[in-house]
A protein has these predicted regions:
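Preference for protein termini
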Residues: 1-453
Length: 453
């Protein structure tokens, strides 16, 4: 018998009243087992053909499940409003922390939490002009808590991976199971990507009249496990795929080396770690383009997102977001955050230590992250010693129980696994905020490891 708690965490039970679920069930019952197996095989083949999900370092490649994740219109409106608010809030926080730092002066954020953070980059102070948004792109990872409510457990701004996967998955579904997509009325993604193209084309607004803006996607290259996603996304957006070695700084701007000479770069979609972007001002051992920060500083380059944004990814803001939202927006946080604690506060440290296996621990000066249950006894003892030696260096984020979603593949047939969603937001001073009308859904039999990936 299904318990009350498990009912709260069953996505399928939430779908029973949706007309899309009725359409899906009707379609499902019309398919033979053999045809479902063939459709699943065709989906995986289509992914291999497109290439975005290819990872040469993985023995087992990603699989696309045959069952879509349904979200009601009411639920989606709530998620959309929450992501828009969150992106604006985080952008304002970064603008302050890399600017006047009033949030620290007013005691809303502890100074040691920010300045000890590996992802807080001093060279990025006053990097972005006040009229521009710090976070043009944001990925928000959500899952359900014990009450069945969606909560954010992580934000991704440094390299918000997954846009290419969502796009590729939708194209594969349209190609292989177009009639199902049509019957359940999936929202179209094209409008979001057109707006993304427009934001990059407008860049800083300083492009010389008559010159077509040059936009690029900056990647580490083939050694990056996500390189094929980068190539797929750049091709779809009709922007150049660039590497640091392709670029040079000259006359206050960033230039692309081509066989016909130098061409000024106006906008970059950055999929390169913050510290590896500029060998002059950031990591001198990296192959980053010297002068990249200066070109942003001089408003000759629009970068999404600029180096320094990874402070958001470190999780240090999570314990303070409700108070920050009240202070900066005079609003309640629309999309709640998983319970998070800064261990530099004694009462919060004791709360974490009393139930440490229920948390994901992050060390802010090294960006290391641990799940207690994945450590052996010696590793647990070593981590506990680190935690007690300097608790100000640790953030603890409570693990969510997560909901389980119906799945189907050719090897297991119909079954259920834990699931999370990654949503994507777009923010620009020229346009109204936008949330991609879809999400990257990930599933796993292990709820904890899913939140740690």
């Amino acid at each position: 018998m299904m318990t009350v708690e498990s009912q709260e965490l069953s996505e399928q039970l939430r779908w029973t009243d949706l007309p899309q679920w009725q359409q899906l069930q009707q379609w499902w019952q019309q398919q033979s087992q053999q045809h479902l197996v063939q459709l699943h095989t065709d989906l995986q083949h289509q992914l291999r053909e497109n290439g975005a999900t290819f990872d040469p370092w993985l023995e087992q490649q990603r699989q696309l499940d045959l069952m879509p994740w349904l979200v009601s219109d009411t639920q989606w409106q709530q998620l959309q409003a929450g992501v828009k608010q969150r992106q604006l809030l985080l952008s304002m926080v970064l603008q302050d922390l890399y600017g006047p730092q009033l949030l620290i002066q007013q005691g809303l954020l502890p100074a040691e939490l920010i300045f000890q953070n590996k992802n807080y980059l001093l060279p990025c102070h006053q990097l972005v002009p006040t009229h521009q948004q710090w976070l043009s792109l944001l990925a928000v990872d959500i899952g359900r808590d014990a009450a069945g409510q969606f909560c954010v457990y992580a934000d991704q701004s440094q390299m918000p991976a997954g846009l290419g996967f969502v796009l590729e998955h939708r194209l594969a579904f349209n190609h292989c199971i177009g009639e199902l997509n049509h019957s359940i009325g999936k929202s179209q993604l094209a409008g979001f990507f057109r707006k993304l193209q427009l934001v990059f084309a407008q860049g800083t607004g300083h492009t010389a009249e008559g010159r077509r803006p040059l936009c690029g996607l900056l990647t580490q290259g083939k050694r990056d496990a996500a390189y094929f996603e980068h190539a797929f996304l750049a091709n779809y957006l009709d922007i150049a795929l660039m590497h640091s070695a392709d670029l040079m700084f000259k006359d206050g701007a960033l230039w692309l080396k081509t066989v016909t000479g130098l061409q000024q770069v106006d906008s970059l979609m950055r999929y390169l770690p913050d510290a590896r972007c500029d060998a002059l001002e950031l990591d001198p051992d990296s192959t980053g383009t010297a002068g990249l920060l200066q070109s942003i500083r001089q408003q000759q380059l629009f970068c999404a997102n600029p180096p320094g944004a990874a402070l958001v990814d470190s999780g240090v803001l999570l314990p303070f977001l409700p108070a920050l939202c009240q202070a900066l927006l005079n609003e309640e946080l629309l999309l709640p955050t998983a319970a998070a604690f800064w261990c530099g506060q004694p009462e919060q440290l004791q709360q974490v230590l009393s139930d440490v296996s229920s948390y994901r621990l992050r060390r802010i000066d090294t960006a290391q992250s641990w799940l207690w249950t994945e450590l052996d006894v010696q590793q647990q003892q070593e981590l506990q010693l680190q935690l007690q030696a300097d608790p100000t260096l640790f953030i603890a984020i409570r693990l969510l129980p997560l909901s389980y979603v119906p799945c189907w593949n050719s090897t297991q047939g119909e079954h259920q696994q834990y699931g999370v969603l990654r949503l994507f937001g777009l923010l620009s001073e020229q346009h109204s905020p936008a949330v991609m009308p879809g999400a990257l859904a990930r599933i796993s039999p292990d709820a904890q490891s899913l939140q740690h990936q």
